[in-house]
Swiss-Prot record:
Listed GO MF terms: ATP binding; ATP hydrolysis activity; ATP-dependent DNA damage sensor activity; mismatched DNA binding
Name the record gives this protein: DNA mismatch repair protein MutL
GO cellular component, one term: mismatch repair complex
CDD domains: HATPase_MutL-MLH-PMS-like, MutL_Trans_MutL
Organism in which the protein naturally occurs: Azotobacter vinelandii (strain DJ / ATCC BAA-1303)
UniProt record, GO biological process: mismatch repair
Entry annotated with the keyword DNA repair: yes
Chain positions covered by the region annotation Disordered: 345-445
Gene responsible for this protein: mutL
Domain of life according to the entry: Bacteria
Protein family membership: Belongs to the DNA mismatch repair MutL/HexB family.
Record-linked Gene3D superfamilies: 3.30.230.10, Histidine kinase-like ATPase, C-terminal domain, MutL, C-terminal domain, dimerisation subdomain, MutL, C-terminal domain, regulatory subdomain
Length: 641
């Protein structure tokens, strides 16, 4: 029997290759590290040249500050960097890179050539490494001010790693996605990407709003920008800005989600949870929201030294960040009105080639416009529309008849259509929407309401209406379901949750950490209708539950809520259960298909949609209405050709 293996130091080459396993996964990983170095160097233009998906060649050239000749050998050494000096620097790091190990890791698994020149140097200098222990030799070279890093034959000395690489096309797609993500992080830098001698991406410096919108459209597609809401909110030292996609512009995969913290692309479960909560009421099951968001915070309150790839971060006050993200997005999604959706978009990219309805085909569900609505606005009253009848020859009710329709509609749908208590008006700073005159009459050409006036009912399911843009199609049941649902939620919020004491308290065995969390949040549980009593270090008693949730499994619900509180600092499970119940009530209490409505009743429903939050989607996330403009209709019938 042999003795125990002796402990010995690893060779520098092996240590670097082990580190490379964490940092260098594929060519895209190399591109990320090199591009981050270029951006940290103050580059205003970055050129990326790729061959065979980045395996044969990956060259990154920039016009940054460059590296001094004496520092070139150190640049290839591990744990050598110019970005931090002390522990205090690490706690407030603002640069994308700071570990000082990327070039050493890359150089251990590839043939690397580093060429650089500073502004005060008479010439450039170059250093090479070939994946083995070798003394770096600095030699003169020809290059302008800036840096060029050339990586050839990736994983040439680690065949096992090379076997795990995908096809050339797949590897290049990953690399191109890295360039796109960094291009969104730095609008002030131009990016040019070439693959096998062909230009794959050319993004010029974006210095103003219009140019930034063009870059977003180039990276995410023109359709995203057309279906996105711009936001900018600043509060308590936090600033959130960017674009959030409308609920109907959702995806089957989470592949159009870009989130940045102080310019650093991150993937964070806390952020994902906050976004998921904000879209919960308006997103169809199995769909994913789209967004490009930038969060700016004090570097001291976020820890970026969590993962070797720096994709993950840790916030000092995660609950505050979560609540800020959720509250901001939830308000923005609820503050869209039909007239906002129908308004021409602001600075956008040049129009893309015609497709869908624009090319003579019927527009798919994913491109349908939608509305969702701000509670701060007054409900629309058709009689108040200015000049509603002037020049409007459609066979639809005049404003006087529309006013009469309100009474008919309220009587028809009583008692569900109870008057709502509108929440207090929020300031533009809090909501991300500029304040000002919000009367619907000021936003519609010719005084015509955003959703127009009803023309007819189709098969007892759809309402056909005419507005200034053309034809509006409304799903009658889905629209009324959302209106009823929002009113039920408002009523519950104003009246509070009534608790129902249990005849026999339910015991709950938990961990001590969960029990401590329950005790800490006892007042929060009380507001939601629960009464929890601690019986021991790891035991709770549920003495009261919300009356609306008397059929729910209270014990499991409390466990799930505590798990969320420990993980994210907040939980929406109780609210989700309540909303699910209210949604069921709204569904059963809404007008059904094949129920014939009069024109006044249809018009009253349209007016209610214009003043109801999130009326663009039903409770299940399906669209409630869509618009076919005159141009769309003309193309369907080949008019003007």
């Amino acid at each position: 029997m042999s003795g125990p293996a002796r402990i010995q130091l690893l060779s520098l080459r092996l240590a670097n290759q082990i580190a490379a396993g964490e940092v260098v996964e594929r060519p895209a990983s190399v591109a990320k590290e090199l591009l981050e170095n270029s951006l940290d160097a103050g580059a205003r233009r970055v050129d990326i040249e790729v061959e065979q998906g980045g395996v044969k060649l990956l060259r990154v050239r920039d016009d940054g500050c460059g590296i001094a000749a004496d520092d070139l050998p150190l640049a290839l050494a591990r744990h050598a960097t110019s970005k931090i000096r002390e522990l205090e620097d690490l706690e407030r790091v603002a640069s994308l890179g700071f570990r000082g190990e990327a070039l050493a890791s890359i150089g251990s698994v590839a043939r690397l050539t580093l060429t650089s020149r500073t502004a005060d140097a008479g010439q450039a200098w170059q250093v090479e490494t070939e994946g083995r222990d070798m003394e770096a030799r600095v030699q003169p070279a020809a290059y302008p001010v800036g840096t060029s890093v050339e990586v050839r034959d990736l994983f040439f000395n680690t065949p096992a790693r090379r076997k795990f690489l995908r096809a050339e096309k797949t590897e290049f797609e990953h690399l191109q996605e890295v360039v796109r993500r960094l291009a969104l992080a730095r609008f002030d830098v131009a990016f040019h990407l070439r693959h096998n001698g062909r230009s794959a991406l050319a993004l010029h410096e974006a210095g103003d709003e219009t140019a930034r919108a063009r870059r977003v459209a180039a990276v995410c597609g023109p359709a995203f920008l057309e279906q996105a809401l711009p936001i900018e909110v600043e509060r308590a030292g936090l600033r959130l800005w960017g674009w959030v996609g409308l609920p109907t512009f959702s995806r089957s995969q989470a592949d159009l989600q870009y989130f940045y913290v102080n310019g650093r692309m991150v993937r964070d479960k806390l952020v994902a949870h906050a976004v998921r909560q904000a879209y919960r009421d308006v997103l169809f099951n199995g769909r994913h929201p789209t967004f490009v968001l930038f969060l700016e915070v004090d570097p001291a309150v976020v820890d970026v030294n969590v993962h070797p790839t720096k994709h993950e971060v840790r916030f000092r006050d995660s609950r505050m960040i979560h609540d800020f993200l959720y509250g901001t997005l939830h308000r923005v999604l609820g503050e869209v009105r039909p007239e906002d959706r129908l308004a021409a978009p602001a600075a956008v990219a040049p129009p893309a080639p015609a497709s869908g309805a624009a090319a003579g085909e019927f527009r798919g569900q994913e491109e349908m416009p939608l509305s969702a609505t701000p509670p701060a606005r007054e409900p629309a009253r058709p009689a108040a529309w200015k000049g509603a009848g002037a020049g409007y020859q459609a066979p639809s009710p005049r404003p006087a008849r529309s006013a009469e329709a309100g009474g008919v509609y309220r009587e028809f749908f009583a008692p569900l259509a109870e008057p709502r208590t509108e929440p207090a008006t929020r300031t533009g700073e809090e909501s991300g929407i500029s304040s000002g005159d919000t009367s619907l009459g000021d936003t519609s050409p010719g005084g015509i309401p955003p959703l127009g006036y009803a023309l007819a009912q189709l098969k007892g399911i759809y309402i056909l209406a005419e507005n200034a843009q053309g034809l509006v199609l409304v799903d009658m049941h889905a629209a009324h379901e959302r209106i009823t649902y929002e009113r039920l939620k408002t009523a519950m919020a104003s009246e509070g949750l009534r608790g129902q004491p249990l005849l026999v308290p339910e015991g709950l065995a938990l961990s001590q950490r969960e029990a401590d969390c329950a005790e800490e949040h006892a007042e929060w549980f009380q507001r939601l209708g629960f009464e929890l009593q601690r019986l021991g270090p790891e035991t709770l008693a549920i003495r009261q539950t919300p009356a609306l949730l008397r059929q729910a499994e209270a014990g499991q619900l409390v466990r799930d809520v505590l798990a969320d509180l420990l993980e994210y600092g907040s939980s929406d499970r109780i609210e989700a259960h309540l909303n699910e119940l209210l949604a069921t009530m709204a569904c059963h209490g809404s007008v059904r298909a094949n129920r014939r409505l009069t024109l006044p009743e249809m018009n009253a429903l349209l007016r209610d949609m214009e003043s109801t939050e999130r009326s663009g989607q039903c409770n299940h996330g399906r669209p409630t209405w869509t618009q076919l403009g005159m141009a769309d209709l003309d193309k369907l019938f080949l008019r003007g050709r």
